[in-house]
């Protein structure tokens, strides 16, 4: 029996869509704290799910459910349209459950993520940032992979802003550039980072260079340690010979 309309999958195809999830927290100035905020709340924060470079993700993401700490009233918040975020105030850090619900055309089950809310600066210069009351940003780059998507969902994933189909052909660099110029959707990581988005090809290449340099340093350290070991064994053998101590032989 043939598959019902809209239930056929595009075989042999996997499509990924990138997004960013995380939180931003800003400490209150004690002298300018809003009157409605509880006395023990020290920060205002927001938790979010958004596209890379704030690209629209609502064509594949229907809604997002945030499960906050049980001490919050209505601690399960469902956001059904962009921006997919929740803003609150508080004093403590905790794990936030984030559940992604996809559009009906996808036929996909919800996926769950976890994010650790950060209120206090971390990493290098944390104390300076704390004194300046800087915004604490904790976010992660993630990719959703849709394997063999339903045909209607495939059309949504590959369509442009007006559900225009992408051009068929060999593709390549020129096709990607054309899609970007006409505002088409792309899953490509941007070439350069921006203040709003630290994820880019440039950042990726810098990290690869850093890892390569670290690997070379480790290899050099291993080489030097091996040379020192050989030298020590040589001196030990000379000492044994001068003292008339027979050299140790390895048992077979």
Swiss-Prot record:
InterPro entries: YEAST_sf (IPR038704), YEATS (IPR005033), YEATS_dom (IPR055129). Residues 200-243 form a coiled coil. It comes from the Eukaryota. Gene3D superfamilies: YEATS domain. Residues 203-213 have a biased composition (Basic and acidic residues). Residues 9-160 form the YEATS domain. Residues 158-168 have a biased composition (Low complexity). Residues 156-219 are annotated as: Disordered. PROSITE patterns: YEATS. Residues 189-202 have a biased composition (Polar residues). The keyword Kinase does not apply. It is found in: Cytoplasm; Nucleus. Keywords: Activator, Chromatin regulator, Coiled coil, Cytoplasm, DNA damage, DNA repair, Nucleus, Transcription, Transcription regulation. One of its GO terms (cellular component) is NuA4 histone acetyltransferase complex. One of its GO terms (biological process) is DNA repair. The coiled-coil domain is required for assembly into the NuA4 complex. Component of the SWR1 chromatin-remodeling complex and of the NuA4 histone acetyltransferase complex. Component of the SWR1 complex which mediates the ATP-dependent exchange of histone H2A for the H2A variant HZT1 leading to transcriptional regulation of selected genes by chromatin remodeling. Component of the NuA4 histone acetyltransferase complex which is involved in transcriptional activation of selected genes principally by acetylation of nucleosomal histones H4 and H2A. The NuA4 complex is also involved in DNA repair. Yaf9 may also be required for viability in conditions in which the structural integrity of the spindle is compromised. Belongs to the YAF9 family. This is Protein AF-9 homolog. It comes from Aspergillus fumigatus (strain ATCC MYA-4609 / CBS 101355 / FGSC A1100 / Af293) (Neosartorya fumigata).
């Amino acid at each position: 029996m043939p598959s019902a309309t809209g239930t056929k999958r595009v075989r042999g195809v996997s499509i990924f869509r990138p997004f960013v999830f995380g939180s931003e927290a800003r400490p209150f100035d004690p002298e300018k704290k809003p009157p409605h905020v509880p006395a023990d709340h020290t920060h205002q924060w927001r938790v979010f799910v958004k596209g890379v470079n704030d690209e629209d993700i609502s064509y594949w993401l229907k809604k997002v459910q945030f499960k906050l700490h049980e001490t919050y009233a209505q601690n399960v918040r469902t956001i059904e349209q962009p921006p997919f975020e929740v803003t609150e105030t508080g004093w403590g850090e905790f794990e936030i459950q984030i559940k992604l619900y996809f559009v009906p055309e996808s036929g996909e089950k919800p996926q769950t993520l976890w994010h650790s809310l950060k209120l206090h600066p971390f990493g290098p210069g944390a104390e300076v940032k704390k004194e300046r009351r800087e915004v604490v940003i904790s976010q992660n780059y993630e990719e959703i992979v849709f394997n063999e998507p339903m045909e209607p969902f495939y059309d949504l994933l590959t369509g442009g802003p007006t559900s225009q189909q992408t051009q068929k052909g060999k593709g390549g660099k020129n096709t990607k550039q054309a899609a970007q110029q006409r505002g088409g959707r792309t899953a490509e990581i941007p070439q350069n980072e921006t203040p709003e988005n630290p994820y880019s090809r440039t950042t990726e290449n810098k990290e690869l260079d850093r890892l390569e340099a670290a690997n070379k340093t480790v290899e050099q350290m291993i080489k030097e340690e091996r040379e020192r070991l050989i030298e020590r064994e040589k001196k030990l053998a000379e000492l044994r010979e001068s003292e008339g101590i027979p050299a140790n032989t390895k048992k077979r």
